[in-house]
Amino acid sequence: MKSPHVLVFLCLLVALVTGNLVQFGVMIEKMTGKSALQYNDYGCYCGIGGSHWPVDQTDWCCHAHDCCYGRLEKLGCEPKLEKYLFSVSERGIFCAGRTTCQRLTCECDKRAALCFRRNLGTYNRKYAHYPNKLCTGPTPPC
């Protein structure tokens, strides 16, 4: 069991980490053991934008994340800019934020990070920095 001092320090450390991209990256790394950069520009959906058919289950995680952010934007949120707080424990990821948009953004990121973890076996380095021109097929609905 960790000492109370270590737990307090870890809570403070998590509380100091704010900024959506930073948080999402930390979530990804904690859930997968991979650098968040390994998911940037992966397949047809991971990174900025997305179109055509996802290349694998990892890419489907990014498609779902894009859809989640799209729903938040329709509610008037700015998920790419929302800053929120979260913590990670053996029991999962816990989201917090002052506003509904912050909490919902955290939930989108949480679902994506957990999806990446569930689908670690589908991650294929050949889809890293995948050229968009190689993406084919219809664009699936959200």
From Swiss-Prot:
Its EC number is 3.1.1.4. Residues 1-19 form the signal peptide. Optimum pH is 7-9. Pfam families: Phospholip_A2_1. Changing residue 66 to A: Loss of catalytic activity. One of its GO terms (molecular function) is phospholipase A2 activity. Ca(2+) 1 binds at residues 45, 47, 49, 66. Ca(2+) 2 binds at residues 41, 43, 130, 132. Disulfide bonds join 44-135, 46-62, 61-115, 67-142, 68-108, 77-101, 95-106. InterPro entries: PLipase_A2, PLipase_A2_dom, PLipase_A2_dom_sf, PLipase_A2_His_AS. Changing residue 65 to A: Loss of catalytic activity. Induction: Up-regulated by inflammatory cytokine IL1B. Belongs to the phospholipase A2 family. This is Group IIE secretory phospholipase A2. The gene is PLA2G2E.
